[in-house]
Amino acid sequence: MQPYKIQELEKCGLFSKLFGSTPTENGWKELNNLLAQAQDVASISADDVHSALKKWGVKFNEENLPRRAALYRQLADVSFTDAQTSDDPLFAQLKRLAELLELHENQVKLADKSARTAAYFQRCRRILSNEEKLDINSINELFGYDYEDGLAIRKQVFQAHFNLLFEDIVKEARYSPEQEAGFRKDCERLDIPYEFKNNIVSALNKYRSLWDAENRKLEPLDIDLPLEKGEVCYVHVNCGLCQNKVVEREDNYFELTRKFNIDETVNFKGEKLEHPKIKEEITALLELGHFFLTNTRIIYLSQKQALAKRLDDLTGADFDGINIVTFHDKDKQEHLLKFPDEAAGVVYILFKRVKNKEI
């Protein structure tokens, strides 16, 4: 009978039977084996139970109540995990086993509650893996749960399921409509809302934008900007014009001495000390403006200047993976533009599509 499995009895001599702990342990193994060999609980009598224990000098008492409750819990786990209806024979066996083990009513309630919770977790997981025969409403009815009773568990099961799949989404940095539809269906099957924490929502929105940039058909935008005949705009976004510069700064040690007001500017002879300088390359933001991507040009406009480059005059672009796209032209000039974090990757993908005429 499930879930019990035959256990091998420990060998012991006469004196260990009389004075040792092994007989007690063998008594519980004997009872376990009785349950394992039976077709069902109904085929076992109270005399069978006591006889199995008696040969090892074991009797029911308050001290071994936890051992009996543990045996009951094993069947309770199976019953609540596999039962299909409230009058399922598994529950009748469970009730009979409680009588055979002479469990107190409160012990039965505690074991049932724990088994019910564990089974609810498992059956919710089986719903998501398409292994469960009942839907969530039928399981709630079987367990005597209302909507709120199992809501926290259902959310927890979905979150664990989502986290595993989210790792692949992050790795690919893409979130397709099919993936979203799958998650929404999972939430529907568990009867929970489709919702995430703000940081997850932001990440999913970013990955969806990248997926759209690669797969959606490009639609022209209406913009207040004079374009050439036959020219249409596909992207308009705020940006910043940047430039790579080499700057000098003081060594970190001397910056630290100034921070703590340590005077090291004068030596013992009264001569001023020159702090060592370190040169480093930085990407400096020069000004803010607007970026436009059309079917023939990239355009940058600000209050101070305008820059337009034909796509045919550009050899390509690089993306730093964060927010800067560098456009390279045939004159070996670089045009660095800084975009909002959520837009930079999209601009880079759309530029490549438009330049390669994959519209």
Question: Where are these predicted regions, by residue range?
Answer:
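Acidic surface patches and DE-rich sequence motifs
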Residues: T265-N267, T294, D329
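Amphipathic alpha-helical protein-interaction segments
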Residues: M1-L210, F291
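Intrinsic-disorder/low-complexity loop/linker signature
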Residues: L14-L18, E264, G270, K332
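Anionic N-terminal interaction surfaces
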Residues: I192-H290
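A short, charged
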Residues: K133, P226, G270, L337-P340
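Eukaryotic alpha-helical scaffold "rod" segments
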Residues: E30-D40, R249-G270, D341-I359
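Alpha-helix boundary/capping detector
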Residues: R123-C124, A213, I324-V325
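Acidic, Ser/Thr- and proline-rich intrinsically disordered linker/docking segments
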Residues: E287, F292, I299, Q303-I359
